[in-house]
Amino acid sequence: MNSCHPPQDEMAGLIGIYAFQGFYGLLSVVVYTFNIRALRHHKNNLDKSFSLLYTCCAALSLTYFLDHFLIRRFVKLGFFCEIILENFGEPNYWMMPYKTIASYCPIAILVFHALIAAHRFSIVAAPMRGVQLWDRYRRLFVLVGFLIPLIFMWFMIPCKSYAELDSEGSGGLDIEYKKVFSISSSLAAAIAAVLFGVLTLCLTFGMLIALAKLSLRKLSQAEISLIVFEVFMTVFTLIYAFTQGILYYSIYIVKDMELKSTVIQFRTFAIDIFILPQAWTLLFLSTTVRRYTLRAFGKRLGVEFLSTEIEKSARMVSVAPATISLQKSTVLNYNFTLQNLF
């Protein structure tokens, strides 16, 4: 449909979906912010490697959601359509930051999910070496994590971008870019999604296999929570990777426009499933993060959720040395400094 605005009979439903996505998305942004602050506040007592990886991943997720929600989903509704077309209908560099962020962030998030899975696998499979490796090279791993996505989208950086009517959807605008190099961004994104999705899955399975060799009855609630966190992260990553793979398959292999339309409708939810739940899983599973968040909300609402005695007790636990049983367990000795984080 070559129209600035979606059909009137669809507009109310689209606005409802947009508002719903905005509500849970912005709420997740707030939770992510508190999670990051909690990890920074307790950085002396928590696993610095995980805290750094999670913080980077959260920052990328926040950037990608705000970029995707405030621009792409906004223009799909046709708001200010004529003004945008008049000013940005021709290729220009003003709109290219959106395309660059929209291409870079999801790949970077995939990479950091794989790094978190690698961190967990190395700590479980080889605790002492894993601890030494991540303590020594965590900043290098993070730097590499930010550079790897450029391999899959560098060719988009010098391109110009422009707004055009969405001729394949239900109206509204789309933002495209003018190619400088004859490289398919869809293919690169699909390869990255499948590659790092499978890598995250393999590392998670490796972690579970290593854990299976231990006495599962000796696992603490903290470690079980940590396993649940990674399993959820892997599932969300695979949902996004599968969606990206099917999208490329529908467009370039079978050229099934009906399948493409169905996948695109689901893709916005797949993106949210991919980038937002890590805020909630850490909040629900981590006692430290949850305690900090409740205390922060309590100060703003004038309510004391936790007494001073509980805070003192928690602080004593967080700095207490490892117990004998903890020292004997090669897994419990380091995972997120489990007794502190969970």
From Swiss-Prot:
Q: Where in the cell is it found?
A: Membrane
**Is the keyword Magnesium in the record?**
no
Q: Name one GO cellular component term.
A: membrane
The record's listing under InterPro entries reads:
7TM_GPCR_serpentine_rcpt_Srg, Nematode_SR-like
Q: In Gene Ontology terms, what is a biological process of this protein?
A: sensory perception of chemical stimulus
Q: Which family does the UniProt entry place this protein in?
A: Belongs to the nematode receptor-like protein srg family.
Q: What is this protein called?
A: Serpentine receptor class gamma-69
**What organism does the record attribute this protein to?**
Caenorhabditis elegans
Tell me the organism's taxonomic lineage.
Answer: Eukaryota, Metazoa, Ecdysozoa, Nematoda, Chromadorea
What is this protein's gene name? Answer: srg-69
